[in-house]
Amino acid sequence: MRSLSSVALLSAIGAASAQAGPWGQCAGISHTGPTTCESGWSCVYLNDWYSQCQPGAATSSSTTVSSTKQPSSTVAAPSSTTSAHTLPTGSGSFAKTDGLKFNIDGKTKYFAGTNAYWLPFLTNNADVDAVFDHLQQTGLKILRTWGFNDVNTIPGSGTVYFQLHDKATGTSTINTGANGLQRLDYVISAAEKHGIKLIIPFVNNWDDYGGMNAYINAYGGSKTEWYTNEKIQSVYQAYIKAIVSRYRDSPAIFAWELGNEPRCKGCSTDVIYNWVAKTSAYIKSLDPNHMVTTGEEGMGLTVDSDGSYPYSKDEGSDFARNLAAPDIDFGVYHLYVADWGVSDNAWGNRWIKSHAKVCEAAGKPCLFEEYGIKDDHCGDSLKWQKTSLTTTANSADLFWQYGQQLSTGASPNDHYTIYYGTDDWKCAVIDHISQI
């Protein structure tokens, strides 16, 4: 789903220090920041644009990268983390597949969850904690939230962003500061404390929070070339490596997701498939313990196809083929009947069952990752929940989207939003969970 509202709240930018703090940037061509790490942290070469302070065997109070490992381009952290900052350090088991179902915390069953794309962009920790309190109390186990926030120019003071793609220099900057990945750090730490599992996508197909066009604006190419442009894919993989390296030991991660609703209109399905296969293999090379999925809408199906637009391959996607990629652990699909030009409950049920058949044939579970109807939260979508719950291989559903009253007012309302504690919350969430 396109995240239609921006939540850009203020937070203090961490001050630069003589040494890079935990997970800070410590080397890179044209890098003018710290080149040593705090005690107990080593400067680790990640790619041609970025070296990062990671936990490791520093033998003295600082560690310096050899000149032979200086990257050939720049990715600098505009504000380094400080020694007072706490990174996620939770313990527990990793979520995994178990046949056609998911296993979380040793339990193999059907799970319910939701989406709250805006959560890492909040700067009030109490607001983040309140969200997780309510998810935990309700019994929602999986939360999908954005792991990206791409910009082409540095925003106003304190505005949260994760990565700068500089149009003038053609270089990328990962923001590990207090208005950057430290916000995602807090979300993951809070998820650990509350026993909630997170799905983290790395890029957006849509322009909200930068998306693929933020890359294109800085490095050239077009939307259909994004998946094959060498410069873009190198920067994209550098970002993946920074994120996965930062959180790969956290049990709060349910799955890494290649992107939100990737499309390549008019392209051969080879384009997205090859990207899926290559990127998922790369993620598994960094982190073999967490699951990986595509983030796609589920378009491009021959099973039970009625010839409608979502079943077609017009957007360059082949659901069954993408699911079959060796390093994809489970399938995901979305459902928005009005946006896609289909309008009844029966079509939605058909869509759910079609994907379940493909997942069952592949021997992998399906996750009904986004669904909803504008301003009608207790109608057809409840029937879709029941269909998902009772169809083999459908093993979890996440409604779009969660809403809550925050210290700054209500969270974004795109008319799909279901606010905690309302009558709609009871019929669409509480009653659904009671049936699992």
From Swiss-Prot:
GO cellular component terms attached to this protein's record = extracellular region
The reaction(s) this protein catalyses:
Random hydrolysis of (1->4)-beta-D-mannosidic linkages in mannans, galactomannans and glucomannans
Q: Which keywords has UniProt assigned to this entry? A: Carbohydrate metabolism, Glycosidase, Hydrolase, Secreted, Signal
Outline the segment boundaries, as ranges, of region: Disordered: 60-88
Specify the domain of life of the species encoding this protein.
Eukaryota
Gene Ontology MF terms: cellulose binding; mannan endo-1,4-beta-mannosidase activity
Where it sits in the cell: the answer is: Secreted
Q: Where are the active-site residues found?
A: 261, 370
Task: Report the enzyme's class at the first EC level.
Answer: hydrolase
Cited SMART domains:
fCBD
**Record family assignment:** Belongs to the glycosyl hydrolase 5 (cellulase A) family.
Name by which UniProt lists this protein? Mannan endo-1,4-beta-mannosidase F
* Gene, per the UniProt record: manF
